Design a protein with these regions (language model features):
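Nucleotide 5′-phosphate-binding alpha/beta core
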Residues: 1-37, 42-60, 64-68, 72-74, ...
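Short glycine-enriched loops at secondary-structure junctions
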Residues: 32, 55, 82-84, 131-132
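Short, flexible loop segments at the rims of nucleotide/cofactor-binding pockets, characterized by
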Residues: 54-55, 81, 102-106
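Active-site glycine/GP-rich loop and adjacent strand/helix microenvironment
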Residues: 99-305
Length: 305
């Protein structure tokens, strides 16, 4: 059963760095059709190999996110995230093309081009970071473009954001909805899950990933619904099928059914990193908990360090 997974050892970022440049490869090198990498804060980059089936699954999980966000083939998807070794641009584009939306692969930055294409191509959805979304909202407001664009939705991710920050760009752009997308290079890239219109937690693809939540100190499972470190096992990846990979991201599994009615399981939004935790008077404190308190005060802005 899936409970037997707990008998297997953990894997970690060190396993990927130790096997550089193509770590933990489980197929013949001739079967690898592409690589992606994450930017390492120290040492060498983590390079992950992909077979053609892996690329197809990457496209599938992103296409599912577009469907969950309520997009149709009539939508126009502007991609304003990084390309190259980073997975984001490739994933957003693969998913958009598989889904069947008109794809506009702009890349990050170049705010003038972003604004021009929003107007000229009547983009209905854009994929970007939360900080880029806020910048776009401010520039649209500054140039009085709100009545000239058709933007309805934003799918954002890859960096922390506050609730107030999200509310700010949603209101400034007059969006119908904004969606927080989850992902990590070790599990294809973006698209491992997305929040629904209810917005509580992230629906994730349980046929592609098995998620455990553990105590980062004891390495034992936490009680149901409690916050701990997310550990992910790939159920479909061919080239580098990571088993019990310690993400060091803090989250929780949400046991209750989602009010949206979907049977897709959920995990909570990422609350921080297990290595960011501090212990104050015997209590574990995480950055996400401090952010939750700050969000209770209307006079506190959405951008802080």
């Amino acid at each position: 059963t899936l409970d037997d997974v707990r008998r297997l050892p953990f894997s970690d970022v060190a396993d990927l760095r130790d096997g550089y440049p193509l770590p933990l490869l489980c197929v013949e090198p001739s079967e690898v059709v592409r690589v992606h990498a994450s930017s390492g804060t120290t040492g060498k980059r983590k390079i992950l190999a992909y077979t053609q089936k892996d690329v197809d699954t990457f496209a599938l999980q992103m296409a599912r996110c577009y469907e969950l966000a309520g997009l149709t083939t009539e939508d126009r998807m502007q991609i304003a995230v990084g390309y190259g070794l980073w997975t984001a641009g490739a994933g957003f584009q693969l998913g958009s093309e598989r889904f069947g939306a008109l794809t506009i692969p702009v890349g990050p930055g170049n705010i003038d081009m972003q604004l021009q294409l929003l107007v000229d191509l009547q983009t209905t959805c854009i994929g970007c970071t939360s900080s880029m979304a806020l910048l776009l909202a401010e520039e649209v407001e500054r140039h009085n473009l709100r009545d000239k664009i058709a933007l309805k939705k934003i799918i954002f991710g890859s960096e922390p954001h506050s609730l107030k920050m999200r509310q700010s760009f949603t209101e400034k752009l007059g969006l119908e909805a904004s969606y927080d997308i989850a992902g990590m290079t070790e599990m294809y890239g973006p698209g491992t899950g997305l929040n629904c219109e209810v917005g509580e937690g992230i629906h994730y693809w349980a046929d592609l990933f098995y998620i455990e939540i553990i105590d980062p100190h004891t390495l034992q499972p936490v009680p149901e619904g409690e916050v701990g470190e997310m550990v992910v096992t790939s159920l479909s990846k061919e080239a580098v099928p990571l088993i019990r990979y310690r993400t060091h991201d803090l989250s929780r599994l949400i046991p209750e059914p989602c009010p949206c009615g979907r049977a897709i399981p959920r995990h909570g939004h990422i609350r921080g990193r297990s290595d960011d935790m501090i212990i104050f008077r015997g209590v574990n404190i995480y950055p996400g908990q401090i952010a939750d308190v700050l969000n209770l005060y209307p006079d506190v802005g959405g951008e802080y360090h």
